[in-house]
Amino acid sequence: MKDVTIIGGGPSGLYASFYAGLRDMSVRLIDVQSELGGKMRIYPEKIIWDIGGIAPKPCHEILKDTIKQGLYFKPEVHLNERVVDIRKKAERHFEVETEAGEIYTSKAVIIAIGAGIINPKQLDVKGVERYQLTNLHYVVQSYRRFKDKDVLISGGGNTALDWAHDIAKIAKSVTVVYRKEDVSGHEAMKTLVTDLNVKLCPKTRIKYLVGNDDETHISEVVLEHVESGDTHTVKFDDVIISHGFDRCNTLLSETSSKLDMHDDCRVKGFGNTTTSIPGIYACGDIVYHDAKSHLIASAFSDGANAANLAKTYIQPDANAEGYVSSHHEVFKEANKTIVNKHLY
C-alpha cells in the first residue's frame, strides 16, 4: 500500500508528487495519457510568462523541468490508465480502480485531473486517420516544421488564430477556414493575423482530403462553402485542425466516493484543497476554493498544499508543512553537485 495515489500527471499532480516525496511519502502517479504533462502538452510552443521567478520561456521547456522535478523521488508511475472509481474502505485505506480492472491501494488520494481527460476533436472526414502521423496535426509541437510551407488551419477560435499568427511569420502562406460568418477568437487577434496576410475564409469547411500517390500525406484539400455548397481544391503542405476539445470528467460523477462539487464541474475545496471526504484532496484546475486562481503557479501551490494535508492525515503528529528545500537534508548531496557546477 502506498501512502498516496495521485490521479493526474499535469503540473499540479507532478508538483504534488514532488512535494509528497519531499515529505517522505511513497507515491503512485496515474495518468490516462501516454505522457506526463497534462494540458501543457497542448501548447508546447507558447511562451509562459506568469510563473514567479521563472523567465519567459516556451511551455515545453517548463514542462520538461516540471516532469523531472515530479519524478525526483521516484514515484510509481502508471500511464495509459483511466481511473474509474475511488473507494474509501476505511480511514487511511483507499482503493483506486482503473478501466482495465487494476486496483491500487493507498492511505490517501490526491485528485489532479485538471478539467478532465482532454482530447482534441477529430476532423470528421473519411480516411483522415491515414494522415495523422504525417502532415495532419491537432497540436502544434514546433513552429519550425512549417517554415516556407503552405499551411491550412481549420477553426476560428483563439487557438486557431494564435497558431495562424505565429506560423504566418515563417510559413509561405497561411489560410484559415471556419464555418461561421466571423471568427470567434479575439477581434484584436483577427486584426493581427490579417496584417500578416493570413487568408481568412468564412463559411468554409474541409470536405475532402486528397492524398499523394501512396496515400501517406495530404497533397490537396477540397474546401466547401457551407451555404452554397460550392467547392474548390487547394494544394497545402500541412493541415492543422483546431476544433476544440472533448472533455471527459465522468470519474467525479461515477465514483463511489461522492464529493461535494462546485457548479457540477469542479471539486469543492473547503478553504484549500481539502474535500468533503477526509483523505481525498484535490489540486489544480479541478478544485475550486475561495483563494483559487487558474495559473500554473497556483497549481504548484495547490499540489504542495494537498501533499501537506495528505501527510498529516496519514500521520497526525507530522508537521503541518515540510522544511524549506534550501535547508532540507534530502538535497544535501545534490546541492554539493550544483554548488560545484556553479563555482568551478
From Swiss-Prot:
Q: How does it assemble?
A: Homodimer.
Q: Which reaction does it catalyse?
A: 2 reduced [2Fe-2S]-[ferredoxin] + NADP(+) + H(+) = 2 oxidized [2Fe-2S]-[ferredoxin] + NADPH
> Which of the seven top EC classes does this enzyme belong to?
oxidoreductase
Tell me if Transcription is a UniProt keyword of this record. Answer: no
Cite the GO molecular-function annotations of the record. ferredoxin-NADP+ reductase activity; flavin adenine dinucleotide binding; NADP binding
- Give the organism, scientific name: Staphylococcus aureus (strain MSSA476)
Q: Does the keyword NADP apply?
A: yes
Q: What is this protein called?
A: Ferredoxin--NADP reductase
Q: Which UniProt keywords apply?
A: FAD, Flavoprotein, NADP, Oxidoreductase
Q: Where does FAD bind?
A: S12, D31, K39, Y43, V83, I118, D285, S326
- InterPro entries given for it? FAD/NAD-bd_sf, FAD/NAD-binding_dom, Fd--NADP_Rdtase_type_2, Ferredoxin-NADP_redctase_2
Report the cofactors: FAD
Q: What is its EC number?
A: 1.18.1.2
- What does the cofactor field's note say? Binds 1 FAD per subunit.
Family note: Belongs to the ferredoxin--NADP reductase type 2 family.
